[in-house]
Structure formats: structure tokens, C-alpha cells
Amino acid sequence: SGGVAKAVADKIKEWHPDMDVKIASAQGLAECKKLLMLAKAGKYNGYLLEGMGCPGGCIGGAGTIADPAKTAVVLNKYVKDAPFTDPEQSPFITSIHMLKDDPNFEV
């Protein structure tokens, strides 16, 4: 859990090393609703919030048709063998630098 938020936080830390990135995440609809209620009440001001509808996320959630343990093995192999580890290295990402260099973009 927290994979997307962690990736975003890692990129923010790369671009702004002195910035503190706080993350709060929830799994399952009940926990997501609780997280949102707490955020609305001001508990998570300044946090990067991540909510996953399925407990266990996309790979381990209730809608999966494959064994989550086997799927995790395949995913980890894919990650290990991926031609790049950072989205900025992907030839398919063409505008991420626009965010970094945009004076109106606030992190």
C-alpha cells in the first residue's frame, strides 16, 4: 500500500530535497471514508493522501482473479527487469518536466 503516494513523494524529495512530504494512506472503502473524514476535519492538512478501494490494493484486492502472492512475484520480477526505474526516464513521459519548471506549480 502507499506505492503511488511513495513514488510521488520520492519525486518531490528529488526535486525539493529539503521538503518534508507527509503521507497518509488507507485501504478499503471504510478506511478511505475515515481518512477523508479526518482530512475534512483538518487532521491531515498538508498531507499527500492515498486511498485504495480494495484492501491489499489493486494486486491483493477482492476483484483479483489471480493469487495475490503469485501476482506479487510476477510484479516484482517486472520491476526488477524494467528498462527504467524512474518515470522521467520513460520515453512516453513528455510533460513531467513542465510541472517541475512551472512557476505556478506548488508542491
Predicted feature residues:
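Iron-sulfur (Fe-S) cluster-binding modules
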Residues: 1-107
